[in-house]
UniProtKB/Swiss-Prot annotation:
InterPro entries: TBP, TBP_CS, TBP_dom_sf, TBP_eukaryotic. Residues 49-65, 85-106 have a biased composition (Low complexity). This is TATA-box-binding protein. Keywords: DNA-binding, Nucleus, Repeat, Transcription. Its main location: nucleus. GO terms for cellular component: nucleus; transcription factor TFIID complex; transcription factor TFIIIB complex. Belongs to the TFIID complex which is composed of TATA binding protein (Tbp) and a number of TBP-associated factors (Tafs). Binds DNA as monomer. Interacts with TFIIA-L heterotrimer. Interacts with Taf1, Taf2, Taf5 and Taf12. SUPFAM superfamilies: TATA-box binding protein-like (SSF55945). Belongs to the TBP family. GO terms for biological process: DNA-templated transcription initiation; mRNA transcription by RNA polymerase II; RNA polymerase II preinitiation complex assembly; snRNA transcription by RNA polymerase II; snRNA transcription by RNA polymerase III; transcription by RNA polymerase II; transcription by RNA polymerase III; transcription initiation at RNA polymerase II promoter. It comes from the Eukaryota. It is found in: Nucleus.
């Protein structure tokens, strides 16, 4: 055995490993951090004898000799990494960025790009996404592009106008009830001699056995008045509120000319009657069965269906031909509101021809 081994070979002891540790398994007491080399183009590589090359060589030597390891001080970095300076972008760079932003906002553009996302948000740039395509193309570029776009928006949209009130959706806009009669009352505040009025006034009649009031008529406005001995007067037949008041004043003037101290107090409209035509026949039998709580229909007594509306408090006379009479209103709007509510109900009971 000793003859087979070389004279310089010695058998290791039990505690000595047979194999040496590999290079990647060895623990270095003070490792040195070497930054990765960055490949640079040939045009950017410094000359061999330049000062930058010498500076890098000195830096590497100092890193290899001095304790700037992982467990000691931080590794020294190149000077370019230590000092960072900020420079204002040039005018050409700003123009290039603005052109890229406008191209991204154009109709054929591909939306937002990283360059456009890095640009500061201004009111003009924020409104550019809200403008229609036609106005973006007309808006122009540069500093005045935002103002031109805003002016184009105002020109396209036109001046702002007050919103018109919406018409009732239930009623047909082509059907509007027309006022047929207005009944009003007034107090003359004096006792009247009805025989004297009937003898001296024109177009007046008085028959106490039939009716205890003087019936007087005038042509303009075409109305009829009922004059009582207590001084109360009822005016009927006017087509509007103003005509009813004018007619009542004319009757009071006639009484004054006959020698009575008549006044004109407490004028009030008591009833308004309107009518309209829905232009289609109506199944009154089905309507009275469905709305039995509000309507009554006795064709043997009266050919129309009587519909008593609760709100507004209006009474409607509905006929099979489609004619509708509305009565009991104090103001004109109540007639319009009642018709707007009854019209969709009548459409449900339209006769199928």
């Amino acid at each position: 055995m000793d003859q087979m081994l070389s004279p310089n070979f010695s058998i290791p002891s039990i505690g000595t490993p047979l194999h040496q540790m590999e290079a990647d398994q060895q623990i270095v007491a003070n490792p040195v951090y070497h930054p990765p080399a960055v490949s640079q183009p040939d045009s950017l590589m410094p000359a061999p004898g330049s000062s930058s090359v010498q500076h890098q060589q000195q830096q590497q030597q100092s890193d290899a000799s001095g304790g700037s390891g992982l467990f000691g001080h931080e590794p020294s970095l190149p000077l370019a990494h230590k000092q960072m300076q900020s420079y204002q972008p040039s005018a050409s760079y700003q123009q290039q960025q603005q052109q890229q932003q406008l191209q991204s906002q154009a109709p054929g553009g591909g939306g937002s790009t990283p360059q456009s996302m890095m640009q500061p948000q201004t009111p003009q740039s924020m409104m550019a996404h809200m403008m229609p395509m036609s106005e973006r193309s007309v808006g122009g570029s540069g500093a005045g592009g935002g103002g031109d776009a805003l002016s184009n928006i105002h020109q396209t949209m036109g001046p702002s106008t007050p919103m018109t009130p919406a018409t009732p959706g239930s009623a047909d806009p082509g059907i509007v009830p027309q006022l047929q009669n207005i009944v009003s009352t007034v107090n003359l505040c004096c006792k009247l001699d009805l025989k004297k009025i009937a003898l001296h006034a024109r177009n007046a009649e008085y028959n106490p056995k039939r009716f205890a009031a003087v019936i007087m008529r005038i042509r303009e406005p075409r109305t009829t008045a009922l004059i009582f001995s207590s001084g109360k007067m009822v005016c009927t037949g006017a087509k509007s509120e103003d005509d009813s008041r004018l007619a009542a004043r004319k009757y009071a003037r006639i009484i004054q000319k006959l020698g009575f101290p008549a006044k004109f107090l407490d004028f009030k409209i008591q009833n308004m009657v309107g009518s309209c035509d829905v232009k289609f026949p109506i199944r009154l039998e089905g309507l009275v069965l469905t709305h039995c709580n509000f309507s009554s229909y006795e064709p043997e007594l009266f050919p129309g269906l009587i519909y008593r509306m609760v709100r507004p408090r209006i009474v409607l006379l509905i006929f099979v031909s489609g004619k509708v009479v509305l009565t009991g209103a104090k103001v004109r709007q109540e007639i319009y509101d009642a018709f707007d509510k009854i019209f969709p109900i009548l459409k449900k009971f339209k006769k199928q021809s």
